[in-house]
Amino acid sequence: DNGGVRANRRKAYIRGFAYPFISKYVLDETLPSLSELTIFSYGFTEEGYLLAPHLDDTFMIEKALSNMTEPILTLTPFDRSGNFSNELISKVVNNQDAIDTLIAQLLNTVKNKGFLGVDIDFEYIKATDRDAFVKFVRQITETMNENGYSVSVDLAPKISADQPGLLYEGKNYGALGQIANSVLVMTYEWGYTYGPPMAVAPINKVRQVLDYAVTEIEPAKINMGIPNYGYDWPLPFVRGTTKAKTIGNVEAVRIAIENNATIEFDETAKSPYFFYEKDGISHEVWFEDPRSIKEKLELIYEYNLRGASYWQIMQLFRSNWLLVDYNFNVEKIKM
């Protein structure tokens, strides 16, 4: 017996995103299984001034450090009203004064608050800002690394270099993967709020993305995204009208039990789903369970990845963390 862990268990970096309104209990239960706690999120102004989250995140930083987990500052293009803005990205990445201000502010905040790194989570970058964004990431990474802090970049799930679409065109996978210390490939949201019912992270789609990612970026730098949530769709699905409800994975099982639903398993997506009826409305639910998680964690071994990044850890999914600890020796801060 090897102490209840898999033979030849390897090291991996396990990261989890969380908002400052996370319950202290959930945070305490999850941190032992995390290498990095990615705190969501810091915005900024057009001049490059950092905007802290509305709620204080100090307790998260302290708890992370006491668990030998690295607290990471997530930088997002959120404006003063908390809205995502790709106009804001354009204005800042093309303005050296704003970049200098933002880097100084980031460094100051990271030092003063006790963060150990920065995660750059910019989405929908314009194709015309592609090169400016690379330069922006390079400047942040150089300054942070010189001061002993790491930088990661989040990447949309591409399957080819010239993939069209707003999510993809502004991200130069190869260049960003070379510059950043690590990347998160966001392998989830195939099933999403406004889309048709399907698995959030079907393994066949995840594989396609990883197959491409490892041609551009060294696997030792890649964290694959794993969703810690599911969706409940009212049926029939009507595009533009139907809106799925986000649910937790434990909650999904509870809904199935309460409605006497049979949980099925899709062998192509390697994901669980079920149908139920309530108040005369049919529903279709897709979520993650220990089987789907096990399939995803296996990919870290198969592709030799850095590890996994969970969006997000707000709801406790205990069986997931047991699987993580069984399969990986989770990297922790070296003292």
Go through each PLM region and give its residues.
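Active-site-adjacent "subsite" loops/lids of carbohydrate-active enzymes
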Residues: 79-108, 112, 161-166, 184-188
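Conserved, mostly hydrophobic/aromatic
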Residues: 37, 120, 183-185, 224, ...
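Glycan-binding loop/region signatures in secreted carbohydrate-active enzymes
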Residues: 77-89, 228-296, 326-335
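Short, acidic/polar
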Residues: 18-33, 95-111, 165-174, 287-301
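Substrate-binding surface in catalytic domains of secreted glycosidases
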Residues: 46-56, 104, 130-256
